[in-house]
Amino acid sequence: MLELLKSLVFAVIMVPVVMAIILGLIYGLGEVFNIFSGVGKKDQPGQNH
């Protein structure tokens, strides 16, 4: 019974942690792509996007 409780607590703790890591990675990748697209736009002054 104690092992079951331990695994349950571990799962409850890990789920938000893993979700936070995934969201952080998505946000970080978005920031990186924004930086790269900003650099690309600076290299091409003829476009108005």
Curated annotation (Swiss-Prot):
Keywords from the UniProt entry: Antibiotic resistance, Cell inner membrane, Cell membrane, Membrane, Stress response, Transmembrane, Transmembrane helix, Transport
GO cellular component, one term: cell outer membrane
Known outcome of mutating residue 30 to R: Loss of chloramphenicol resistance, does not bind AcrB (dominant-negative to wild-type). Partially suppressed by AcrB H526Y
Regions crossing the membrane: 8-28
UniProt GO BP: response to antibiotic; xenobiotic detoxification by transmembrane export across the plasma membrane
Record carries keyword Transport: yes
Entry-linked InterPro entries: AcrZ, MEP_Accessory_AcrZ
Periplasmic side: 1-7
Self-association state and partner proteins as the record states: Part of the AcrA-AcrB-AcrZ-TolC efflux pump, interacts directly with AcrB.
Family, similarity comment: Belongs to the AcrZ family.
Protein name, per record: Multidrug efflux pump accessory protein AcrZ
